[in-house]
């Protein structure tokens, strides 16, 4: 466990260095999807376990901070994912009932948290492919953000 904590701290340090140096890049399709959401006046929050100070810097460097109506960060809730707190707070801040909200997640704990909050979970796997539990908890799974963007376009034109 001590070795795990050391590795976790080293990873966090490298991540924050990359963020500060402007080395982080958006995944393909994210900016276009966020633009569509904004253009269609769909309320949008970011619910992340990362501290607000770091998130604000990252989103500013990436040029997407203005796409989010609310930022709900790990230092703003008592319990982190897989507890539903961060998603419930995001829905509350947006004034949207969880059952009427989508949560887009790439992690198992994020999917668990959003599902526990009663949200419609969209999984876009990153490092780990979905297992049976994730397939059960997610409303839909896309290979990439383009799939989710197309899904939104169908919903808003239906």
Q: Residues of each region from the PLM?
A:
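Metal-dependent phosphoesterase signature
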Residues: 1-32, 40
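Residue-level "hotspot" positions that anchor or transmit function at local structural transition points
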Residues: 25, 46-47, 78
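Asp-based, Mg2+/Mn2+-dependent phosphohydrolase catalytic module
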Residues: 31, 35-38, 51-158
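Surface-exposed, interaction-prone regions with an acidic/low-complexity signature
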Residues: 43-44, 71
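Hydrophobic beta-strand core positions in alpha/beta domains
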Residues: 45-46, 123
């Amino acid at each position: 466990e001590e070795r795990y904590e050391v590795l976790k701290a080293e990873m966090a340090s490298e991540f924050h260095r990359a963020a500060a140096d402007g080395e982080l890049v958006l995944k393909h399709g994210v900016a276009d999807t966020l633009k569509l959401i904004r253009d269609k006046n769909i309320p949008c929050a970011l619910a992340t376990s990362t501290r607000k100070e770091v998130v604000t810097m990252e989103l500013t460097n990436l040029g997407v901070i203005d796409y989010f109506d609310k930022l709900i960060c790990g230092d703003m809730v008592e319990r982190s994912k897989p507890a539903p707190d961060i998603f419930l707070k995001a829905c509350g801040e947006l004034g949207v009932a969880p059952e009427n909200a989508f949560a887009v997640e790439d992690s198992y704990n994020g999917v668990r948290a959003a599902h526990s909050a009663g949200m419609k979970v969209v999984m876009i796997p990153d490092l780990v492919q979905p297992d049976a539990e994730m397939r059960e908890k997610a409303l839909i799974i896309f290979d990439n953000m383009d799939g989710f963007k197309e899904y939104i376009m169908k919903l808003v034109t239906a």
